[in-house]
């Protein structure tokens, strides 16, 4: 079953996005998304 995880901006730390992730995957998710605080496309990493 999948669980909901938050994505935090790598630069400023803002948590703008949530997504679903399978529980059996141990690698932390990294996606390039738009950050409203930085006003740019940045890497967003899975937050704890």
UniProtKB/Swiss-Prot annotation:
Q: Which GO terms describe its cellular component?
A: cytoplasm; ribonucleoprotein complex; ribosome
The answer on whether this UniProt entry bears the keyword Protein transport reads no
Membrane spanning stretches: none
**Keywords attached to this entry:** Ribonucleoprotein, Ribosomal protein
Gene Ontology MF terms = structural constituent of ribosome
Biological process terms in GO annotation: translation
Q: Which HAMAP family match?
A: Ribosomal_bL33
The protein's name is Large ribosomal subunit protein bL33A
Name its species.
Exiguobacterium sibiricum (strain DSM 17290 / CCUG 55495 / CIP 109462 / JCM 13490 / 255-15)
Gene of this entry: rpmG1
